[in-house]
């Protein structure tokens, strides 16, 4: 029973993982969560794989040491860099990631088998999505790195002609490839979904991993009998803690736009320099 009452740990390089946190809150409203946005070290996209792995595992170490019952890597770049290491390192704590849920949804959604994937430089270069799609029959995958998208989202700029022009430039190869399904391979990108849809056209289905990741987490917690019991006392509500390794005020201003009243302040935490074990 004590494990059932433990919180769920979630982390991302910044605010992008809040799209995953929002879906988890919606689907698992009774669960306590601890979210860490690594704004002091992020964005992760331009970093090397060893740097991404070190930052990610340092945060994972911290969350697991605090007794989380599950760890959600709410970042495509981190998932592509350290998923295998994290699962070995933190076993028996289950680790849920964002790539496979998005792949499954895209395969189910496509009509012509031509699927686009956009992500950070590190995610696209890792080949993680290409590998994940390899088992899918009758699909052709086209990838494009969109490195500047994260910078705009982290600055709170999610609309305007400048961002639309950037999106049109990035996405032109995918339009020429006639993809009918586009995976938003970074948890920041759903915050630009309106612009991305406008650039791609209404006939293209956008796939975000947030809701599918929350479903995966629900499945894992159910299988391991780790779901938190619904409280008998209606005054007992879930505890949701949000932390940032960078400026907590800047993080709060951005996060409040996506979480609203769910967000009750952001705690500053020390910057994680790297994994030690």
UniProtKB/Swiss-Prot annotation:
Substrate binds at residues 12-13, 44-45, 76-77, 187-188. Pathway: Cell wall biogenesis; peptidoglycan biosynthesis. Provides the (R)-glutamate required for cell wall biosynthesis. InterPro entries: Asp/Glu/hydantoin_racemase, Asp/Glu_race, Asp/Glu_racemase_AS_1, Asp/Glu_racemase_AS_2, Glu_race. Gene3D superfamilies: 3.40.50.1860. The gene is murI. The active site is at residues 75, 186. PROSITE patterns: ASP_GLU_RACEMASE_1 (PS00923), ASP_GLU_RACEMASE_2 (PS00924). Belongs to the aspartate/glutamate racemases family. It catalyses: L-glutamate = D-glutamate. The keyword Isomerase applies. Its EC number is 5.1.1.3. Signal peptide: none annotated. GO terms for molecular function: glutamate racemase activity. This is Glutamate racemase. Keywords: Cell shape, Cell wall biogenesis/degradation, Isomerase, Peptidoglycan synthesis.
